[in-house]
């Protein structure tokens, strides 16, 4: 199960945050704390980052978000905010939800449609880049 953290009053307009890869829903807290006096901020954490949980599918994550929103009485989202790979999940949410949404803000979404042949060519290079980052203990990023 996904974990959900909320800030603000449930009766205020709702903002739903989708976090980036490598962080939890709490990464949106600095912004949510600023907005909590006027908005009900919902910060889900993907099951990938929930201890003892197993990621099933994007559809399952969306189902969990929908169920949580319903349990909180959310009938309208003023804003959906998503960063990096979270934008991918947010886009899937947006295309399947029946909830009305006022605004959407994506920061660094990954929406490129890369063909199978190109992926096959690029995979070894990506693997090497990840290994290089591991071997350098992250020092490669500071150069």
State what each model feature region is:
Residues 130-143:
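Helix-loop "lid/cap" segments that line or gate small-molecule binding pockets
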Residues 13-14, 79, 103:
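Structural motif
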Residues 95, 101-132:
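Flexible "cap/lid" loop of the alpha/beta hydrolase fold
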Residues 42-81:
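Active-site loop/oxyanion-hole signature of alpha/beta-hydrolase fold enzymes
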Residues 81-90:
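Gly/Ala-rich beta-loop-alpha elbow adjacent to hydrolase catalytic centers
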Residues 5-51:
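Conserved HGGG/HGGXW glycine-rich cap/lid loop of the alpha/beta-hydrolase fold
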Residues 21, 40, 63, 105-119, ...:
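Membrane-interface segments of envelope glycosyltransferases acting on lipid-linked substrates or membrane lipids
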Residues 30, 92-96:
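Active-site signature of alpha/beta-hydrolase-fold catalytic machinery across serine-
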